[in-house]
Amino acid sequence: MKNPTKKKTPAARPKPLALRSQAWFDNPANADMTALYLERTMNFGLGFDELQSGRPIIGIAQTGSDIAPCNRHHLVLAERVREGIRDAGGIAFEFPIHPIQETCKRPTAALDRNLQYLSLVEVLYGYPIDGVVLTTGCDKTTPAQLMAAATVDIPAIALNSGPMLNGWYEGERTGSGTIVWRAREMMAAGKIGYQEFLKLVASSAPRLFCVV
């Protein structure tokens, strides 16, 4: 006869996973899915030993593209980021996110910011990423990516390259963006022609993202 007062020995709790990505690549409690994810991810050129090495997988959220010149410099900077991740012992996964180029697509700044936020949340939540480097720039890309990282609650570093430098035109400073309104007034008053208007405006956008 069983002793009703005898306490049952509680089952041993599984050890918590050290890294988020272990749920995909090194989870003894779910061996079949681990094997499936390993097979799929090896297509990226990563080996079995690398994926189960205990090294963190760090994402690089890439905002740069030819369609978004405001952040195109991040295509070059991401190579430095990748090298830094590797040298620190991590594994880099670079991926694109929704582009934002407000000067070509108006008035949709808030919509594009929200789309970038939503798309980044889906990537960070659904893929084996332990931390992420955010390639930010303007007042849309920065909050969109910071909110996404906070929503998924994973470690993040924001790499912001800084605002656009002021330009020069015929020996005088042309402010980033503000010269556009002055140039329009000058052309309307007949002080400059159409071609000079274009040159004056173009001089105010030498590189990086605008500060308007």
Predicted segments with their positions:
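Active-site cavity-forming subdomains of large catalytic enzyme subunits
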Residues: 110-212
